[in-house]
Amino acid sequence: MTRQAAEVAKRRTFAIISHPDAGKTTITEKLLLMGKAIAVAGTVKSRKSDRHATSDWMEMEKQRGISITTSVMQFPYREHMINLLDTPGHEDFSEDTYRTLTAVDSALMVLDGGKGVEPRTIALMDVCRLRDTPIVSFINKLDRDIRDPIELLDEIEAVLKIKAAPITWPIGCYRDFKGVYHLADDYIIVYTAGHGHERTETKIIEKLDSDEARAHLGDEYERFLEQLELVQGACHEFNQQEFLDGQLTPVFFGTALGNFGVDHVLDAVVDWAPRPLPRVANERTVEPVEEKFSGFIFKIQANMDPKHRDRIAFMRICSGKYEKGMKMRHVRTGKDVRIGDALTFFSSEREQLEEAYAGDIIGLHNHGTIQIGDTFSEGETLGFTGIPHFAPELFRRVRLRDPLKSKQLRQGLQQLAEEGATQVFFPERSNDIILGAVGVLQFDVVASRLKEEYKVECSYEPITVYSARWIECSDKKKLEEFSNKAVENLALDGGGHLTYLAPTRVNLALMEERWPDVKFRATREHH
């Protein structure tokens, strides 16, 4: 095996998906602890703390104490190199969260055992389904009261339409939480709470049918056996291929706060989740072990560092090897650029990078020339697909405080749209400018960045738009007919693409029914 193939085989690139407050921050912290990336868990501090979490960047995040921005953390574990992409998990998240999922090979779904499947989890799973991303599941908070575990598995299957295969099974919960039982390998992992940065020694009881297990479970023993019978009768067995196809998720139980069960999940990512996968480009499929370098941009981040007024473009490497000072072609512009200062991400300790392989994420300094979806290569004309725009779910009309600044406003919005901070629409029948976003916070971010970076002050007004759909139609005559009929609701987006702004859900359904030859798309590829 070549050095490059060996490096690729070691890589695991995944993201965590969860509803806010299901425990994502805590589990991230414990995962970093396992990779000894942070000496003391707790660098990702609580909101009340005045020392800010290392992955909270922009000014506004400091005020709100949330990580709007998606950071990337790389750490070693069991002779593998783990790339963990953090997804903004606050009530207000953004299209970045969705796009981050296009750059990973697998995902870890964290559910709150007391609440089960929540709305944000459903939305994120829909995005994972676009690429059949393999999902590992962790049911968290067993140190509190949780719902019946069988009920939780049923809910995963019914709501998320994915088979659930329990790997471990909880013995009690809350004050009676005694650990988990490994279904396939017949042993108990005893629960001892490890607080903060303690890693407690794992105590294992071999075989459920043993005096030691009976003593540990006490009065619960018989009841646990009955429950197990139910579980083994009703649940799916783990199947590696179905997992890789995104049709089945292995389920683990534990408590991130008590530092219990998190290692089981990380082991599953190492043992079962795929190494960096081939990526589809318009021209061909690119294999990760190819010698020539290639990668795509999935996110652009403004001033990660208040001291450096720069933008960082996050690139997922798809093939080859990045070496410091190498030349690569920016395919969209046709220009060759020498990259001497790519960044690797170790939370916010920004480090200069010497080399990186397929599956790794690197940061390029961007002075406004790089856009989301851009491909970089060693000269070959490639355009990676699967980094879409997602239909916004919230809309506002923009109002300028100073009408003379409309040029700066358009310029600023164009730039912010290319960075993926918002989507901008220009209705065909009016001079309005409409912004679209996936999370409310995006509007605040845009307003504060327009003010700081473009010296433009704006306010927002509500507008009746339910959703946006990108219009495609191969029949020119039909498209013209449709455009004349629907002109009141048509707009061009920032890239000049025809978009239908549906005022209501009913209206959208009616239009789709009336115009069967017109495709109303909820995602649009970049470029």
From Swiss-Prot:
InterPro entries: EF-G-like_DII, EFG_III/V, G_TR_CS, P-loop_NTPase, PrfC, RF3_C, RF3_dom_3_sf, RF3_GTP-bd
Keywords assigned by UniProt, alphabetized: Cytoplasm, GTP-binding, Nucleotide-binding, Protein biosynthesis
Domain tr-type G, residue spans: 9-277
A Pfam family of this chain: GTP_EFTU
GO molecular-function term, one example from the UniProt record: guanosine tetraphosphate binding
Gene Ontology, cellular component aspect: cytosol
Chain residues that bind GTP: 18-25, 86-90, 140-143
Identification of the protein by name: Peptide chain release factor 3
Organism: Pseudomonas fluorescens (strain Pf0-1)
